[in-house]
Amino acid sequence: MKLKNILLACLTLLLTFLLGACSSNVSDPGLDNWSKYEEKKQITIGFDNTFVPMGFEQKDGTYAGFDIDLANAVFEEYGIKVKWQPIDWDMKETELTNGTIDLIWNGYSATDERREKVEFTIPYMKNEQVLVSKRSSHILQANDMAGKVLGAQAGSSGYVAFESNPEILKTIVKNHRATQYQSFNEALIDLQNDRIDGLLIDRVYANYYLTEEGILDQYSVFSVGFESEAFAVGARKADRTLVEKVNTAFGKLYQEGKFQKIAEKWFGEDIATDQVKAYKNN
């Protein structure tokens, strides 16, 4: 009996230790966790590791992209290291809410629907949803997609825009739905192989990918009427200090010319929003 009690006590201590260790690696969703990030000197950012040129995995297994470089520069200002966590993009808000990641940062459009769940930083870059089609298909405007098969990434801004503005594409495409993909790469493969006729996608991704692959001349990239978007960083509602710190770093990096240097590397031009250019911590 005495041995049993000792074993139970040891098991209780072990479970307590393991739970404590696990909880220390997960941020509390209901608290402002800035002091914890400072203490650990680490923050976890969730991203889609196929979204070129914003954040993607290279052939050697390392991560690269505009958002990767920008986020690393932001947290370097505070002596905090970024842990990059690839996630299912369709589950991004869930991963944020449950504390698995601390930020969503990867070409994340700040929409009214998302603002209900997420605290956004100031927008740092503009974007729009465009349609990509093969030139040989002669699809050059939205109406040309009548009865055609459309593709989009699940959980993407493009898919949200498709559902929210049915008059633009949903009412005319085949079956009034978009084939959903887990990544843009998968969708582009299907477009190349004629399994879909058009792909709703971020302009920055389309231009960069098709240019890098040397196939831009084989495709048409055009607007179909969706409103332009703004990329911002998403945090939990309680993490207001974190949001302010990111905003402050945006402004500082721009004033020092570092923001522009990163933008030039990936886009060949300064893409900062007016909010970034004018931001000063009050």
Residue ranges of predicted features:
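Extracytoplasmic small-molecule ligand-binding "clamshell" domains
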Residues: 26-107, 245, 256
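Extended ligand-binding regions for polar small-molecule ligands
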Residues: 23, 68-77, 143, 148-149, ...
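A ligand-binding cleft/hinge motif common to bilobed small-molecule-binding domains
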Residues: 91, 108-116, 161-164, 189-193, ...
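C-terminal motif of bacterial Sec signal peptides marking the signal peptidase cleavage site
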Residues: 18-21
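Short helices/loops that flank or line small-molecule/ion binding pockets
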Residues: 85-86, 90-103, 117-119, 143-146, ...
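Flexible hinge/capping segments at coil-to-helix
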Residues: 36, 133-150
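Ligand-binding cleft/hinge of the Venus flytrap
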Residues: 57, 71-80, 158-180, 210-215
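Periplasmic-binding protein-like
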Residues: 49, 126-133, 203, 211-248, ...
